[in-house]
């Protein structure tokens, strides 16, 4: 589904992501990483802290959760014309001595509130697997170590970063806001 240039919002807010998993804090980690990748695109985005503060005020004044408030009303409060919603749909962290898996799956969607239209919906996942069949006592120790290394916190950070990169690569950039690089006319060196 192609998105026309007129449909792409210019000022976008990334709302808190829903967590449909048992992993505490994963939605916030994915949202921050997603925002870091999204902020390099030529959209005008609202800082997450400002979005969060205004959402708290909006939820208090309406008595509803952010997911129950119409997108247009959210954008009026935030001063934007587009919203990005997100949901963590799966998270796995498995360690079984000879095998380990670390995985996350998320869904994001962009809404243009001026047109009252969902522009895109993306779902992607990243999984890291490690393991082997040990054939000697030494290889059993090495397999256990390598599978344990796969579920460290740094691996989780890499996995989340990779997921958010993949999602952001699929989001179109508005042409009118693409930053022009300066033309290099001359280079002087010593």
Feature map (PLM): residue ranges:
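A generic structural micro-feature
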Residues: 78, 98-103
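Surface-exposed, polar/charged interaction patches used for macromolecular assembly or partner binding
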Residues: 17-18, 64, 107, 121, ...
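C-terminal/domain-edge helix-coil "capping" segments
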Residues: 1-8, 74-77, 113-190
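N-terminal leader/capping segments at the start of a protein or of a new domain
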Residues: 1-21
